[in-house]
């Protein structure tokens, strides 16, 4: 604990010196702050390396233990999202509720939403009449 206090004290001295002086104070503060950080780093290097290695190993173990549960959770969320999208499509009139079939696994059937018209501005599209079109024949 004394190591940390001594290092922080040196850093604090640097900050105080910077506040009292201008350009010279800033340079001195930088030097003392660096000195304090290096002091703490040199005294705790071995402990930090061991601690980081231990934390990394424990994290790896926990990720392995939780990994299966996360995959299951993501699958459930995706399923509920697809079901919700189908309900919204039916409620807005894009598809009829009787077209929202379910497969044997309970998942919506593929291709249900593929034929839905895309309308980003929420305006109805009308096809132009064929009278305004001319036949085009490319030149050879």
Swiss-Prot record:
Residue numbers spanned by region Disordered: 99-140
Subcellular location(s) per record: Cytoplasm, Cytosol; Membrane; Nucleus; Synapse
Function: Neuronal protein that plays several roles in synaptic activity such as regulation of synaptic vesicle trafficking and subsequent neurotransmitter release. Participates as a monomer in synaptic vesicle exocytosis by enhancing vesicle priming, fusion and dilation of exocytotic fusion pores. Mechanistically, acts by increasing local Ca(2+) release from microdomains which is essential for the enhancement of ATP-induced exocytosis.
Protein name: Alpha-synuclein
GO cellular component, as recorded: axon terminus; cytosol; extracellular space; membrane; neuronal cell body; nucleus
MF annotations from Gene Ontology: copper ion binding; cuprous ion binding; identical protein binding
Modified residues (Phosphotyrosine): 125
Any coiled-coil regions, as ranges: none
N-acetylmethionine PTM positions: 1
Family: Belongs to the synuclein family.
GO annotation terms (biological process): chemical synaptic transmission; regulation of dopamine secretion; synapse organization; synaptic vesicle endocytosis
Subunit-level organization: Soluble monomer. Homotetramer. A dynamic intracellular population of tetramers and monomers coexists normally and the tetramer plays an essential role in maintaining homeostasis. Interacts with UCHL1. Interacts with phospholipase D and histones. Interacts (via N-terminus) with synphilin-1/SNCAIP; this interaction promotes formation of SNCA inclusions in the cytoplasm. Interacts with CALM1. Interacts with STXBP1; this interaction controls SNCA self-replicating aggregation. Interacts with SNARE components VAMP2 and SNAP25; these interactions allows SNARE complex assembly and integrity.
PANTHER family to which the protein is assigned, alphabetical: ALPHA-SYNUCLEIN, SYNUCLEIN
InterPro entries per the UniProt record, alphabetical: Synuclein (IPR001058), Synuclein_alpha (IPR002460)
